[in-house]
Amino acid sequence: NSVQELAIIRDIHVGMRDCSNPVVYFTVDMLFGSSLQIIEDIPAFIRETGCYKLEDLEGKACVVEKTSDWMIEYVCLKK
C-alpha cells in the first residue's frame, strides 16, 4: 500500500550522474524525515512544474508517494 504525503522541496541542484547525464536533484522534507530525489527527465520536470529557474522551487510544497518505509518518490508539485 502506498501513501501520498505533502513535502517541501529543499536544496535543489543540477548535476551529472555517473553516466554523464544531467539530472535535477533535491531533498524533500516531510513530517517524519527527508529523502533525496533524482529527476532524470529534466524537460518533463520543467514542463510539469512550469518553472524555468530551478531555484524558484526552493520551499515549494510537493506531493510524494511513500511505497515502503525506505522508498519515497516525488509525484508532483502541490497545486
Identify the meaning behind each predicted range:
Residues 1-79:
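Short beta-rich binding modules
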